[in-house]
Amino acid sequence: MTEAPTEFPPEDGTPRRELGGDWVIRILGEIKEEALKHFDPRLLIALGNYIHSRHGDTPEGARELIRILQRALFVHLRAGCNRSRISQTRRRTPFPAAPTPRGMY
């Protein structure tokens, strides 16, 4: 993957800022808090350990964890979580565009 472009310091001489560092930490905290309401904490710990073993304690690891948790929460809520306002009313498949395989009615 390509690296993020280097940010040049502002003309007024203020120090450089980290690209999205504070935002990533804040969003990760919010998503982890929401994920704990819907998923088993042991699963989230295992996922965090897996991401940490692949990326270490880096912003890339935090971003990957955010992406995975966002997708998991979306699918979970779309499939019909009782706590969700966006869940579907009919309880068939969370992906209505995917046809049911033959013989599996």
From Swiss-Prot:
GO terms for biological process: symbiont entry into host cell; symbiont-mediated arrest of host cell cycle during G2/M transition; viral penetration into host nucleus. The keyword Signal does not apply. Its main location: virion. The modification Phosphoserine is found at S84. Pfam families: VPR (PF00522). InterPro entries: RetroV_VpR/X (IPR000012). Keywords: Activator, AIDS, Cell cycle, Host G2/M cell cycle arrest by virus, Host nucleus, Host-virus interaction, Modulation of host cell cycle by virus, Phosphoprotein, Transcription, Transcription regulation, Viral penetration into host nucleus, Virion, Virus entry into host cell. The keyword Repeat does not apply. Stimulates gene expression driven by the HIV-2 LTR. Prevents infected cells from undergoing mitosis and proliferating, by inducing arrest or delay in the G2 phase of the cell cycle. Cell cycle arrest creates a favorable environment for maximizing viral expression and production. This is Protein Vpr.
